[in-house]
UniProtKB/Swiss-Prot annotation:
InterPro entries in the record: Acetaldehyde_dehydrogenase, Acetylaldehyde_DH_C, NAD(P)-bd_dom_sf, Semialdehyde_DH_NAD-bd
Entry-linked CDD domains: ALDH_C
GO MF terms held by the record: acetaldehyde dehydrogenase (acetylating) activity; NAD binding
Keyword Oxidoreductase: yes
Family to which the UniProt record says this protein belongs: Belongs to the acetaldehyde dehydrogenase family.
EC number: 1.2.1.10
Reaction catalysed by this enzyme: acetaldehyde + NAD(+) + CoA = acetyl-CoA + NADH + H(+)
Protein's name according to its UniProt entry: Acetaldehyde dehydrogenase
Binding positions (NAD(+)): S13, G14, N15, I16, S174, A175, G176, P177, G178, T179, R180, K181, N182, N285
Keywords noted in UniProt: Aromatic hydrocarbons catabolism, NAD, Oxidoreductase
GO biological process, one term: catabolic process
């Protein structure tokens, strides 16, 4: 019983959904059963079918009729902020936990090394009081947020940060139609999470799509203004330790330069290489998003499993 995998569905068969599927198939706690899309010719759906998943191009309503029979407990939504709200409502009404990879930000923000554990312990407490509370949805912010907010949090846990600004540069080829439609949501959601989770008093986010050929690797720049003169040693140690934590689930996450100190400004320059699961290694923006979501899903699955074994032992 204890080793049983938790069945999951992937909503969205684009770059992010497909990369996530490939990673989830290697998971020891998650079992990908369904992939849902809206374009029957999408490469993601074809791959999912070839890999033995059940697929539909008729959108989420088709999946909803199979939730109970296939015992789907967690769904990962990699569609678009515009449709996430409706998807979330339908999934939660069936008792499915939702991990949101769009910038819709309905549920609380989740940046694994910063706040995943505290979110899940809150979730457990809430679940006991009132199942289906907001704990049923966790939002993974954005690829730029996953890459940079750990760094801002690493600085702000040492001393107060008045302002945090991030610039995420991604290869145009790695940005599918969903990402492109969500640019405004990307900047808003990331800036908000820089404040809420990163701990900066004010946050700003910029995304740049670089059309260069061959495609460039994901680059992220973080600038923070500290309230007082920065404590060089403490900030450097905190940032390096945070980078190691992120590397545990995103091996291609690297410090290119920094922390660089100039007056009250602290700058950190990062590069994120992907594992090359779906798109080549330049698409580190897919990996940081899907790896963070996978890590969150696996922790959630462990919680669901231990809750199930507790229930079983009460029978």
């Amino acid at each position: 019983m204890v080793n049983k995998k938790i069945n999951i569905a992937l909503i969205g068969s684009g770059n992010i959904g497909t990369d996530l599927m490939i990673k989830a198939l290697r998971s020891s706690t998650l079992n990908p059963v369904w992939m849902v899309g809206i374009d029957e010719n999408s490469d993601g759906l074809k791959r999912a079918k070839a890999l033995g998943l059940k697929t539909t191009h008729l959108g989420i309503d088709e999946l909803l009729t199979h939730i109970e029979a296939d015992n789907i407990q967690i769904a990962f939504d990699a569609t678009s902020a515009y449709v996430h709200e409706e998807n979330n409502r339908k999934l939660q009404s069936k008792g499915v936990k939702v991990i949101d990879l769009t910038p819709a930000a309905i549920g609380p923000y989740c940046i694994p090394p910063v706040n995943l554990e505290s979110l899940l312990s809150q979730t457990e407490n809430q679940t006991q009081i009132n199942d289906g509370s907001i704990s049923g949805n966790l939002n993974m912010v954005t690829c730029g947020g996953q890459a940079t907010i750990p760094i801002i949090a690493a600085i702000s846990r040492v001393q107060s940060v008045d302002y945090g600004e991030i610039v995420a540069t991604i290869a145009s080829k790695s940005a599918g139609p969903g990402t492109r439609k969500n640019i405004d949501e990307f900047t808003r959601t990331t800036a908000d999470a820089i404040e809420q989770i990163g701990g900066a008093r004010q946050g700003k986010a910029i995304i740049v799509m670089n059309p260069a050929e061959p495609p460039l690797m994901m680059r992220d720049t973080v600038h923070c203004l500290t309230q007082d003169e920065p404590d060089v040693e403490a900030i450097t140690a905190s940032v390096l330790s945070m980078i190691e934590q992120v590397q545990e689930y995103v091996p291609g996450y690297r410090l290119k330069n920094g922390p660089v100190f100039d007056g009250n400004r602290v700058s950190v320059f990062l590069e994120v290489a992907g594992l090359g699961d779906y798109l080549p290694e330049y698409a580190g923006n897919l990996d940081i998003m899907t790896s963070a979501a996978l890590c969150t899903g696996e922790m959630l699955a462990r919680n669901l499993r231990s809750n199930m074994s507790v229930k079983d032992s009460h029978h």
